[in-house]
Regions:
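His/acidic/aromatic-lined binding-pocket segments of jelly-roll/cupin-type domains
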Residues: 24, 42-46, 85, 95
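Short acidic-glycine-tyrosine-enriched beta hairpin
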Residues: 44, 59-90
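Single conserved hydrophobic/aromatic residue that forms the stacking wall/gate
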Residues: 1-7, 11
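Glycine- and acidic-residue-biased ligand/ion/polar-headgroup-sensing regions
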Residues: 40-58
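Conserved short histidine dyad/triad with adjacent acidic residue
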Residues: 23-38, 88-90
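Double-stranded beta-helix
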Residues: 96-123
């Protein structure tokens, strides 16, 4: 993923029994995320403060020969403090954070160890 500024993980802990990971993020500057999935895991995003402009992408084609997933824009919405959103396995989304933001993300597994899809936006 490409970001204009990286997130600062203020907390990341993996539960040894379930494998779930809890991550607390602080974005003090603009942060723009590329369309991505969470591989074979799901994720729950909880907005603690600020706003995130989130875009959902529709999978148009999965090309197994070059391992590329083509997507097109589906919808864009604003996540405000108190909003929570579940992203199931394979769901493609991208966040834009223009102002300071704090958020909590719960992952079904530690994403540091999971391969993510190679996603390409088509128009």
């Amino acid at each position: 993923r490409n970001h204009s500024s990286a997130a600062s993980d203020v907390y990341k802990r993996q539960d040894k029994d379930t494998g779930f990971c809890v991550c607390g993020h602080v974005h003090d500057n603009e942060a723009i995320g590329s369309p991505h999935d969470h591989g074979t895991s799901w994720a729950i995003y909880g907005q603690a403060s600020g706003e995130t402009e989130m875009t959902d992408w529709e999978i148009v084609e999965k090309n197994n020969s070059d391992d590329v997933v083509n997507v097109k824009l589906k919808k864009t919405y604003i996540m405000k403090a108190g909003d929570v959103h579940f992203y199931d396995v394979g769901h493609v989304h991208s966040p834009v954070r223009k102002h300071p933001v704090r958020l909590l993300r719960i992952e079904g597994a530690n994403l540091d160890n999971i391969k993510r899809s190679n996603i390409k936006v088509i128009t």
